Regions:
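Nucleotide 5′-phosphate-binding alpha/beta core
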Residues: 2-159, 166-203, 209-216
Length: 216
């Protein structure tokens, strides 16, 4: 005769505590609140990214996009020239509907790049912000050589899986990379709550601490 196991009294963790545990786990990805920019506020601010009131969400979105448009316009010569050809400047973005005016670079652009040292120059030309000194060894470096040299200099070169036959490469500063990684992780654990709360927390802990997210 089989004995019935006593029911276990499992207490569900509250969503507030769930997010607090997550933020504690990924603290190194969160900049001090006093240093938050509008994009930081949009990503780190909402406790639940899927339940932000529409009016508040549109305000966060508008401020973040306008800030980043101005940032790329002023700190990326290639994008600045592209916007001037389209006759669009940050001063033209005054209300939410103006977001549609912001020039977008086609994804195919990031798949069209040269080889060797010319690839390094290509990465530098599409980067937004101050470009640190990058030392590349060898006369004919391959893609990995160039990427590793950039990463060692403070860049984070993200790239796609290349399933289409060619990788997409996008160079970022470490802070921009961190905010994107945080957003991916927070969205995943928020969607999983409460069904897989403990499992997802363990997965994200392994991802962050194991360095999987740092592969780009």
């Amino acid at each position: 005769m089989n004995k019935q196991k006593p029911e276990q009294n499992v207490q569900m963790i509250s969503f507030d505590d769930y997010i607090k545990k997550f933020d504690k786990l990924v603290q190194k990805y969160i900049p001090p609140k006093k240093d938050w920019t509008p994009p930081d506020q949009a990503v780190y601010g909402p406790k639940d990214p899927f339940r932000v009131p529409l009016k508040e969400g549109k305000e966060l979105q508008f401020n973040a996009i306008k800030y980043q448009f101005k940032n790329h316009y002023e700190n990326n010569n290639m994008y600045n020239s592209f916007c001037k050809q389209m006759n669009i400047a940050p001063s033209d973005i005054k209300k939410y509907d103006d977001i549609e005016k912001i020039p977008l670079i086609p994804g195919e652009f990031y798949k069209d790049y040269p080889n060797g040292r010319d690839f390094a120059m290509w990465l530098a030309n599409i980067f937004t912000g101050h470009i640190p000194q990058v030392k590349i060894s060898g006369k004919n470096p391959n893609f990995d050589d160039v990427i590793n040299s950039f990463n060692a200099s403070g860049f984070v070169v993200s790239y796609s899986s290349g399933t289409s036959g060619r990788h997409t490469f996008i160079p970022r500063d470490s802070r921009t990379f961190d905010i994107s990684e945080y957003a991916i992780a927070k969205n995943s654990i928020t969607m999983a709550y409460p069904v897989c709360s403990q499992t997802m927390m363990m997965i994200n802990k392994k991802l962050f601490h194991g360095g999987i997210f740092n592969q780009g």
